[in-house]
Amino acid sequence: MAKKSMVEREKKRERLVQKYAAKRAALNEIIHDQSLPMEERFKASLKLAELPRNSSATRLHNRCQLTGRPHAYYRKLKLSRIMLRELGSFGQIPGMVKSSW
């Protein structure tokens, strides 16, 4: 199980990303719009740089919802391989059955 502080840090980052997503998108639109004057685009890039670093989506790291494990993460289920196997063995994931041939 991951440290609680790491899990909480990741949750804080997720909240920041959601909070600043619209503002970031608007500033990026201005920065990449070639029809606007260079000065206006530069001001937008400075405003983007003033936003918190943790508000960038690239700072997020996928973690297991149950354990907080950052490695071997299955995006569809939001679980690590260990919890996927454990819950699958107990039949707690709908449609998942143990393989036998």
Swiss-Prot record:
Gene Ontology MF: a single term: structural constituent of ribosome
Pfam family for this entry, one: Ribosomal_S14
Coiled coil: none
GO cellular component assignments: cytoplasm; small ribosomal subunit
Family matches, as InterPro entries: Ribosomal_uS14, Ribosomal_uS14_bac/plastid, Ribosomal_uS14_CS
Keywords: Ribonucleoprotein, Ribosomal protein, RNA-binding, rRNA-binding
Gene3D superfamilies the record matches: 1.10.287.1480
GO BP field: translation
Quaternary structure note: Part of the 30S ribosomal subunit. Contacts proteins S3 and S10.
Function: Binds 16S rRNA, required for the assembly of 30S particles and may also be responsible for determining the conformation of the 16S rRNA at the A site.
Family affiliation: Belongs to the universal ribosomal protein uS14 family.
Database matches in NCBIfam families: PRK08881.1 (NF006477)
This protein's name: Small ribosomal subunit protein uS14
